[in-house]
Amino acid sequence: MDFLIDALTNWLKEMLVGGIMSNLSGMFDSVNSQVADISVQIGQTPQGWNPDIFNMIHTLSESIMVPIAGVLLAIVMTIELIQMIADRNNLHDVDTWMLFKWVFKSAAAILIVTNTWSIVMGVFDMAQSVVAQASGIIGSDAAIDISQVMADMEPRLMEMDLGPLIGLWVQSLFIGITMWAMYICIFIVLYGRMIEIYLVTSVAPVPMAAMMGKEWGGMGQNYLRSLLALGFQAFLIIVCVAIYAVLVQNIATEEDVIMAIWTCVGYTVLLCFTLFKTGSLAKAIFQAH
């Protein structure tokens, strides 16, 4: 009877140990690939990220938004002229410089609207340059490597009792699911930011048309701040990845494999949390809303 119990126990141990090793091996491959892809993704301009989407957004902006911006520009500058006249006692105190000022502001507004796309792309080109320089300075490997920790793991697991092994198997299964969730979160942050950039740039001529208006100018100014926030969000993401890379380098020295794995999970959750916060932080820095 004892022989059967021992055989059954060993069989369960082998099955649980095999399941644990299977769950842990390659667990971080998807997260590592996604983290490594962060620098590539955020270091690209809207045109380089997906040329087809870029061309579609450019066409929509030029064919639909620019005419609307022209109408808005005419309304804004007409209101501006009326206010300038009203402020000067209904033409009783009008000076010639007022008309020159209005003509200059109108010309500047037209110039801004006609060159909106170049201005917007210039913001992201500048942000790309900043990210490229930051990546060159940081240059850290952010891949999680637990191969050293798992080298002698299987013999140690076989020495454990059945109860703790069941607990470890459940933990390894849960950690594997968590890693896939983290992979999806990182994917959402990266692709969500790029889609937001395309959405914001598609309507660029409309807020830029109001840039020179006295009362409407806040629309254009806030739009520019939003562009800068989106651009420099990439720099904040690079900093997050750099901090994450420094943290994960110390994992290989951990002797307790489960502690090392849970530490990996904690660092990855922390990375996802900070990535989600970069958008609001960038907007707070540039006072965009």
What spans do the regions from the language model cover?
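Alpha-helical membrane-interface segments at transmembrane helix boundaries
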Residues: 57-66, 97, 101-104, 162, ...
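Alpha-helical transmembrane segments
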Residues: 208-225, 252-254, 284-285
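Long, low-complexity, intrinsically disordered extramembrane tails
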Residues: 1-2, 283-289
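Alpha-helical transmembrane segments and their helix-start/interface "positive-inside/aromatic belt" motifs
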Residues: 1, 5, 9-23, 94-112, ...
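Binding/recognition "hotspot" determinant
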Residues: 1-72
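Non-cytosolic segments of integral membrane proteins
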Residues: 16, 31, 106-203, 237, ...
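Hydrophobic transmembrane alpha-helix segments characteristic of membrane transport
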Residues: 72-110, 203-217
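Juxtamembrane "helix exit" motif at the C-terminal ends of alpha-helical transmembrane segments
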Residues: 70, 74-86, 237-252
